[in-house]
Amino acid sequence: MATLFTNMLNSSFIILDGGMGQELVKRAKHKLTPLWSADVLRDHPDLVVEIHRDFIQAGADVITLSSYAATPTRLAKYNRQDEFEALQKFAINAAKQACHEMGLSTLIAGTLPPLPGSYRPSERLGSHLSQQEYQRILDQQYKHVDLFLCETMASIEEACISTSVAMKSGLPVWTALTVNEKNGSFLRSGEHIIKAAQAVLAEGASALLVNCSTPETTTQALNELAPHVKTMGAYANGFLTVEPLQGHATVDLLKSRQEINPNTYAEFAQEWLLKGAKILGGCCEIGPEHIEKIRSLRQNDDYEEIIKDY
């Protein structure tokens, strides 16, 4: 597995998929609830397979399990904790089916997300409870995935706990940080991104990424990380702001940025490549069309010369 990743990185850059959740919103026409993505995973697994396939077709080398919302804490909040194992299995089966149907060597990433919900660094379970919960998720996923993605980590504590648990799998671990909407030098917790990078890399992560942040602050964050991180990446979102979600709203209150179309997103992605990113993809509001444009950067004959001249 290590050789495969090395070959992929040496050839150019690795392409992740885009935002599964917002694609489900657009296609499922399902009633939006705090656990809407889990509802779709349970009720319409065929749609999850379809979206995975579309991202693979667009050029994704890695797809991520669609179990982001299926943490024990989030499920228990709505008295649905008994669905945990079933939802994890639905997500695993959907990803495997999509890879099988496409017949390509696409890798599957397990996901260790924020346990109470995204963008809420002040809502902590405590170190011991967090470790236990991440271990439960890991136990469901590790036999079925090629790597682990600890994503949308909003604080150093959250990032380090998830990374340390993921390292127990023996698989590659990539950790993705989400940054302040106005200053990409800081996590949403207010902690400096360099301190976060140092702490996460000390836990053993083999790549450090910035995710579910605006493209502009993602660029800022990569500027900070570049001198300190050997393998870094980015997958930004297309939201105007995520502040409503900090108040436990549903995603229908979030507004997308119409200017973040596939072409403009690819322009940001090219800038990230020039800063040294080796892993690129998309988060919320970034669909297969955006990923296809990122793939076109890899197909650009001038790409290697651009990097050499930078």
Question: Predicted regions span which residues?
Answer:
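Domain-level signal for soluble alpha/beta catalytic cores
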Residues: 1-310
